[in-house]
């Protein structure tokens, strides 16, 4: 079987696995794998989908919003007036420098929050609705979850009477997350996953322990409020009572400075001039006037426990490394999917050996290195 055939089989198998785990998590509130492992599958699916767009177009995972089922009905899904587009990701400092050179009027730097993207809609001075980002074109109505946020983060009323929308990231601080895990009979494992689950729970199933714990980091408004710069718009949002993304400087990129109590995975660099926003516009899925610099990976050494082999419905075989629990940037990890038999062989995994696990810019854990001499016999794939 050629490489293309193997990749096509893997693409179809990933489609099957993603839909299976999405249904478990969103509709049945069951997690068989960690959010990091799910991210691995989605990232690999996107890589292969870019190589084989014609095949990917016919798969259910491509471009679909998986709604959460609540009390035998789905959350209301609403189409956005303006798509909630993403940002182009860069991983090196020279890429940031090159981008800044293309921008007129200067740039601003903000932490890239790691939480749940939300849109808040205001009319006649009142908050009327809140939606998740969804698939960027359509989002889910989570207005009932506003009570989970701290009062000084999302105002219920504002002085302006015109209709406008505010977008930002819903998140929980590390200190509040630790507090929650101390008082909750069922501790949460990951901050981002927990926030998503809490906000997207039904009104009758809201977690009372979370009420007033969540924060909001605003980073966009549909109205410029007659102002000329992004800095002025964000200052206006802060004056109106919104929490906003922390403003930082280029040194946080130069020295890879992470926030101490806020979950972040990088720095967003934006054109400050509103005219530049209009001039540069956007591409198919990303804004042209902003980029996201992703912090380099954090590594942790742990011990390999075993390797298991998953066989999907299409017959594709996927090796999975199981290792002693390790926490990186607030996320507990115990498993890493190795995307191919070649990767499994190249690592040279041995029984009980030490491995180096890295959580990289996309918050995706994988095995970077195996210390083969610290283990026993070389692990070999089974015969199928």
For each feature predicted by the language model, list its residue ranges.
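C-terminal interaction appendages of subunits in large macromolecular complexes
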Residues: 41-51, 334-384
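Long, charge-dense accessory insertions within large macromolecular proteins
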Residues: 91-97, 168-170, 174-341
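Flexible glycine-rich surface loops and low-complexity tracts that mediate binding to linear polymers
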Residues: 153-158, 162-177, 351-366
């Amino acid at each position: 079987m050629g490489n293309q055939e193997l990749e096509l089989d893997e693409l179809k198998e990933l489609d099957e696995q993603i839909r299976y785990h999405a249904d478990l998590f969103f509709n049945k509130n069951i997690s068989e794998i960690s959010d990091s492992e799910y991210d691995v599958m989605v990232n690999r699916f996107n890589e292969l989908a870019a190589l084989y767009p014609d095949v990917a177009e016919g798969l259910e995972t491509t471009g679909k919003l998986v709604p959460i089922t609540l009390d035998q009905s789905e959350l209301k899904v609403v189409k956005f007036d303006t798509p909630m587009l993403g940002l182009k990701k860069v991983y090196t400092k020279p890429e940031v420098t090159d981008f800044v050179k293309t921008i007129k009027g200067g740039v601003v730097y903000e932490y890239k929050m790691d939480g749940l993207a939300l849109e808040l809609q205001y009319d006649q001075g009142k908050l009327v609705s809140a939606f998740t980002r969804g698939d960027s074109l359509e989002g889910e109505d989570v207005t009932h979850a506003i009570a989970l946020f701290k009062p000084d983060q999302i105002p219920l009323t504002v002085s302006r009477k015109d209709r406008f929308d505010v977008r930002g990231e819903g998140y929980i601080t590390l200190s509040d997350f630790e507090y929650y895990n101390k008082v909750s009979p069922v501790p949460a494992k990951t901050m981002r996953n927990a926030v998503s689950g809490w906000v997207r729970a039904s009104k009758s199933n809201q977690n009372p322990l979370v009420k007033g714990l969540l924060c909001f980091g605003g980073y966009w408004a549909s109205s410029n409020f007659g102002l000329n710069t992004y800095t002025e718009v964000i200052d206006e949002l802060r004056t109106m009572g919104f929490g906003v993304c922390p403003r930082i400087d280029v040194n946080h990129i130069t020295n890879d400075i992470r926030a101490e109590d806020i979950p972040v995975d990088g720095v967003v660099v934006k054109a400050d001039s509103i005219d530049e926003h209009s001039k540069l516009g956007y591409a198919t899925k990303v804004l042209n006037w902003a980029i996201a610099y992703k912090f380099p990976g954090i590594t942790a050494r742990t011990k390999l426990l075993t390797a298991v082999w998953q066989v999907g419905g299409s017959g594709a075989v996927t090796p999975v490394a199981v290792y002693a629990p390790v926490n990186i940037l607030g996320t507990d990890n115990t498993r890493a999917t190795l995307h191919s038999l070649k990767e499994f062989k190249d690592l040279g995994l041995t029984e009980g050996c030490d491995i180096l696990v890295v959580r990289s810019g996309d918050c995706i854990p994988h095995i970077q290195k195996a210390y083969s001499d610290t283990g026993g016999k070389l692990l070999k794939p089974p015969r199928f």
